[in-house]
Regions:
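Acidic, metal/ion-coordinating pockets
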Residues: 1-253
Length: 253
């Protein structure tokens, strides 16, 4: 089976654009399941019920998030009610779930969301936490969205889960890396999938806003520029009988 994983969606305009392109991407890559990181899909940061529904109605099967999961209080009920919108599992005992198991009929796919420790909000140890979760999952097809800042921590998680999960996909930094590989002949890996956001921007945010923040030291409201939008993603080919990743392809369009 082929699984599409789309990097952090930044802002509503980027979400709209992604949804307009998803049908063709799915056809071109024969996609069976689509996972989207939507933690910044709302204008002004975070995720809202509106931006989440936009992605789900536009073709996402599962939405993962990250350190901005709870930036918007209006999402709390949706985290509780939804089986396909997840937040980092090691983010404490709070609203929602840290993993889901998606029933595709012929097989099931588990998706785990984890938050890194380095340079991030306080959270439980993701290495210890993922061990607990894996004991609860009874499918070999397992995708891990590791939302983390440090490359070293992401690489370590890749090796830690080598042979135990189908893929470890880094998110959060919004810059697609050039190190996709299959670890141990089993686990697809990339340090960062990248983002879906404005090309002429600073990590999806209006460049003038970020420059003003860095030169004046005053807080700035995040706004999102108009113009061309890029989509960063990966497509995983997985043997659904044993969960082994046989190919990982980057998308940068």
């Amino acid at each position: 089976m082929n699984i599409l994983f789309v990097g952090d969606v930044v802002g509503q305009t980027s979400g709209d654009y992604l949804c307009s392109r998803l049908p063709k991407i799915k056809r071109d890559y024969s996609v069976d399941l689509t996972i989207v990181n939507g933690e910044n899909s709302a204008d002004g940061n975070g995720i809202t019920p509106f931006s989440a529904n936009l992605l789900l109605n536009g073709g996402a099967d599962i939405i993962t998030t990250g350190n901005h999961s709870f930036r918007r209080r209006e999402m709390n009920d949706m985290y509780e009610e939804s089986d396909v919108i997840i937040r980092p599992a090691n983010f404490g005992d709070t609203y929602g779930k840290g993993y889901c198991v998606f029933d595709m009929g012929r097989t099931r796919v588990a998706v785990i969301n984890l938050l890194g420790m380095a340079y991030m909000d306080n959270c439980d140890n993701p290495f210890h936490f993922v061990d607990k979760i894996l004991k609860e999952i009874d499918t070999p097809n397992i995708i891990v969205d590791f939302h983390a800042e440090a490359t070293s921590e992401k690489k370590a998680m890749g090796y830690y889960l080598e042979g135990r999960v189908s893929a470890v996909l880094g998110t959060h930094t919004h810059v697609q890396t050039n190190d996709e590989e299959i670890l141990g002949g089993h686990t697809g890996y990339i340090t960062d999938v990248g983002m879906t956001g404005a090309k002429r921007s600073v990590l999806g945010v209006d460049k003038d806003v970020i420059i003003a923040r860095l030169t004046t030291y005053y807080p700035q409201k995040h706004t999102y520029p108009e113009g061309d939008i890029m989509i960063n993603a990966v497509v995983l080919s997985i043997d659904e009988k044993n969960g082994r990743c046989t190919e990982i392809k980057k998308i940068n369009m």
